[in-house]
Structure formats: C-alpha cells, structure tokens
Amino acid sequence: MVAAIIAGAAVAAAAYAGKYGIEAWQAFKLRPVRPRMRKFYEGGFQATMNRREAALILGVRESVAAEKVKEAHRRVMVANHPDAGGSHYLASKINEAKDMMLGKTKNSGSAF
C-alpha cells in the first residue's frame, strides 16, 4: 500500500516537472533573439589599403588621435601576434593599418 502511494507521488511529481519544463521551453523559444556576438565586417581585404579599411582593422574611427591608434594597434597585435600563434599575413595587415592611420605610408599597397 505504501509503495503504491510513493509510486503515485513520484509519477505526479514527474508529470508536474514535465509540464513546467515544457512551459519553460516554450517561453524560452518565444523570447526575442538577441545577438550574442558583435557584427563583424564580412568582406576581405582590399588590394590597396585605404583609411576606412585601416580603421576597420584596428577597430577605431577614421578620425582618431594617434594615441588611440597606438593603443588599438597594441590590443589587436597582442591577439594576433605570430609568436603567439597568429598569422604573419594578419600581423602585416595590422601594421600596415597602423602606418596608414598614423600617416607613415605612401599608400603603395600591401606586400602580399
């Protein structure tokens, strides 16, 4: 007799848990979708780097102070340095972007 009561209580508890689980899942699916990551630039590199592309690479505005360019260059290079497993190509593009933003380039294009 006691076993039947315990079994009935267990079945009722499982039914209520299932009901609330389904309701929670439906509420979760109905919530508005929020982007989990920032939207990144989907295009590739241009043949000749311009100021806009340099600003996109460094993550700064086109009309930014030299100090901010240097800070952004350091931040991006730490994340993409070849000695830390980054790409030599990306490192060269990052350096080219810094030179472009600081006005140290003759706009001759990339070495690659």
UniProtKB/Swiss-Prot annotation:
One term under GO cellular component: mitochondrial inner membrane
Membrane topology label: Single-pass membrane protein
Main location, first listed in the record: mitochondrion
Stored InterPro entries: J_dom_sf
Disulphides: none
Subcellular location: Mitochondrion; Mitochondrion inner membrane
Assembly and oligomerization: Probable component of the PAM complex at least composed of a mitochondrial HSP70 protein, TIMM44 and TIMM14. The complex interacts with the TIMM23 component of the TIM17:23 complex.
Protein family per UniProt: Belongs to the TIM14 family.
This protein's name: Mitochondrial import inner membrane translocase subunit TIM14-2
